[in-house]
Amino acid sequence: MTSLDDTIISYQNIMLLDNMTNYNKPAIDYFHHEFNDASLEISASWTLLLKMRKHKLLRLPSCSSEDVLDYNMYLVRLHHCLWRRWSINHYGLQNSKSNPLSINWNKETDVTVLYGPDLTNIDSNENEISPVQNQIDQKQTKNLKSALKKNTECWVTEEVDEINASIESNDNALVKLEDISCPSSVDSHTSSIFDQHSTCTKISSIDEDSEDLMNEKKEQFPRKLKFNQAVMKREIDSKGTIRESLININDIQHSRHHRRHHRRHHHHHHQNSSHSDETIKEAHYEFSNYTFGTMEEDIFYRNQVVF
């Protein structure tokens, strides 16, 4: 820190700047000034002098700041004077002082007064201003709390309205979910884990506040899953010919003899089982929008697999 511009803007630094620029501010005698021990004025002044010994930021009444040696020597004298007075007060040595009349003073060299900057009012003024500032801060805090309280009440009211609206919309969504959800396959000969307690996964996004209500609603309306009877299978050979076939995936109950001789009596099975043909034709109609072209019926029957 080489100039006043490098200092941090604080109350203490402003007071030091005032001491540097305000020539009407009186100096004090460090030998005889009555420092307040309760507010630790000696220790506070000593600390400031210790910080300022490397910087010419104090206006000393008996020397020039342009003379570096004189300025430093004077500052050291002020610092040592405060240190001695602080030690006397700390150890209770007031009665151990020498009688000034018993000393043979040399008027040419001995100094009986030592004037320096008044650094005691820096902390005292700050303490006097702080209660007023605290009152202002308390008023601002009260106003802030009241404003926050009003805003919080308005916010809570708006949130309650939004939650009620979301609950009503969720009730309507549950009705739509009844149409979206599909029952499980009635042809299944084994029980499925999806039949009793599962729900349809096509649920629109809802607010977190009404998530518990939605879970209760879904428990009241258990839904089942539905699977297609068959899936489309496309094959492309090396010549680019496209062949489509339907594979029956529904777990229709068949006899063991039928499953054992399925491949041997493949064509005979289609002649005698019209129900299976109708089921596959319905599934083929569902996938007609995804075909690459018109396929002949003989290709369809030749490539189908039923199990």
UniProtKB/Swiss-Prot annotation:
Present with 1960 molecules/cell in log phase SD medium. GO terms for cellular component: cytoplasm; nucleus; vacuole. This is Uncharacterized protein YKR075C. To yeast YOR062c. Residues 255-272 have a biased composition (Basic residues). Residues 254-278 are annotated as: Disordered. It comes from Saccharomyces cerevisiae (strain ATCC 204508 / S288c). InterPro entries: Glucose_repression_reg (IPR052292). It comes from the Eukaryota. One of its GO terms (biological process) is cellular response to glucose starvation.
